[in-house]
UniProtKB/Swiss-Prot annotation:
Leading EC class: isomerase
Positions bound to substrate: N14, N81, G91, N92, N166, N202, E220, R221, G230, T231
Catalytic center residues: C90, C229
Keyword Isomerase carried by entry: yes
Protein name per its UniProtKB record: Diaminopimelate epimerase
Keywords: Amino-acid biosynthesis, Cytoplasm, Isomerase, Lysine biosynthesis
Location in the cell: Cytoplasm
Family listed: Belongs to the diaminopimelate epimerase family.
Organism for this UniProt entry: Rhodococcus erythropolis (strain PR4 / NBRC 100887)
Length: 292
């Protein structure tokens, strides 16, 4: 093929290159993914969302087996971090993925399942057009992994390990205000306990709940600081509720890229927020092949 189609989108400024690859012909070798996501030599993105049916990915050997609850006919979000590593789940990515399916005409229903390596994620597309979408994602179980800590700017932040399909360390600190949060240096990877998180961890620094909301910044494994992290907002909301002495509730989570609404109920989380599709185009196959 001479070119590859792509779309560029973001969920609260957590941005992605969307690659429709229904026949699973594109080789997402890490060096290629890294180049495509590079903001100087590629398109620039926090990650790549490959669009294909789960069964097609399994047949091609991309998936060893279908994850829990995912059927062969389900659309599957094959997510790659900007360094080329594979991630189990991305909440902002699912919103953009679902919006793309609707806007491109690949999906006709407003409620459907998106498969991920963390399992099936039911979505509801409340409204959309070619540019803007409003999507809720059922994020699945929220698992408390126990307490740990992160070191940022020479300061130790106590936090709770939370699994939302991928590992997080959400640190709620009573001394952290929005102003203190904005001054933190997240350009350097935070320190964490590799024995507690042997596969790395996404780290959130979170303010306590005030007027129903929190502020959050996040350092994502394999990426660095991003302007938003969907699973991170769920982890942050769950940790903030726990800090507030509650197991359930709704929290408005404010990130650098905007706001999302997280609801925690019955040990599971849901995430509602915007999606924006900003561009469509083609990638030169000659450039792509030169990356090998």
């Amino acid at each position: 093929m001479a070119t590859m189609d792509f779309s560029k989108g973001h969920g609260t400024q957590n941005d992605f290159v969307v690659l429709p690859d229904l026949d699973v012909r594109v080789d997402l070798e890490p060096a290629r993914v890294s180049a495509l996501c590079d903001r100087q030599r590629g398109l620039g993105a926090d990650g790549i969302l490959r669009v294909a049916r789960a069964g097609a990915l399994a047949d091609a050997g991309v998936l060893g087996a279908l994850p829990d609850g995912v059927a062969a006919e389900d659309w599957f979000m094959d997510y790659r971090n900007s360094d080329g590593s594979i991630a189990e789940m991305c909440g902002n990515g699912v919103r953009v993925f679902a919006h793309y399916l609707k806007a491109s005409g690949l999906e006709s229903k407003d409620e459907f399942v998106v498969g991920s390596r963390a399992g099936a994620r039911p979505v509801v597309v409340h409204g959309y057009d070619a540019t803007h979408g409003d999507v809720t994602v059922a994020m699945g179980p929220i698992k408390d992994l126990g307490t740990s800590s992160a070191t940022i700017d020479g300061r130790v932040f106590a936090g709770v390990g939370i699994d939302v399909g991928n590992p997080h360390l959400a640190c709620v600190d009573e001394h952290v205000t929005a102003e203190v949060l904005s001054a933190l240096d997240l350009s350097v990877s935070p320190g964490f306990d590799p024995g507690f998180f042997p596969h790395g961890v996404n780290i959130e620094i979170v303010t306590p709940i005030h007027d129903g909301g929190v502020h959050m910044r996040v350092h994502e494994r394999g990426v660095g600081e991003t302007r938003s992290c969907g699973t991170g907002t769920v982890a942050a909301a769950a940790a903030a509720l726990k800090f507030d002495g509650r197991d359930e509730g709704s929290v408005l989570v404010r990130v650098l890229g905007g706001e999302v609404q997280v609801t925690v109920e019955g040990g599971e989380g849901s995430l509602r927020g915007p999606s924006v599709l900003v561009a469509n185009g083609t990638i030169s196959d000659a450039w792509w092949q030169s990356l090998v």
